[in-house]
Amino acid sequence: MELTSPKDLSELNLAEPVIFKLPMDLVNIDDFQKHLSQANLENLQKIKDEREKIRFIKTRGLVNILFSLENSEADPIWQLNKYGKPYIAGWDKNFSISHSTDISVVAVASEAIGVDIEDNGRDIDLGKFKRTKFLNFDEGAYESKEEFLMRFTALEAYLKYIGKGFHEDAKNISVRKVNDAIVIDDGSLIKAEMIKNGGYTISIVMNKKAYLKGANYG
């Protein structure tokens, strides 16, 4: 769902997974900022870069709006797990946030979820990644930037899904293309869902039960 205004959320059903794509511009930014909590506003004051401020306002504002749809009488209390992954205390929804140059994405589900977005136009030194062996990808990953980003976004989404980010050694996680699907193996197998949209590659990783429900991608 491409979201420009919080007013677009009136019919939203959070019983199923959903992903939002937010343009990083000033359009309707006040409608997002007014939903920031006091703690959010205090953290916003610490951000100096204007683009980072827009990202913070729109993504945090959106998450707070979604929280309020189910908790109209409560204030969102943002916390971080020990690896720095944000969550809202007491909310039975899991969310994940990712940024590219001009777009941010927010994914929300009742199950664990991770999302990553990358700009297909970014410069990537495939040879360097292949030489350093920092990543545990199959050889096909280095055939083109498109193939690499399919694996890389899946890996990043998976690391957010488990709540560790790059605190987990990426070498321990195998990412392979199997029958046109991206499969992640860290001792058990999980498939990444992928969206190619408007010059971006987006990957989502969720609990297998959540896949059976189907995600609403708009």
Residues of each region from the PLM?
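Core catalytic alpha/beta fold that binds nucleotide/phospho-ligands
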Residues: 1-218
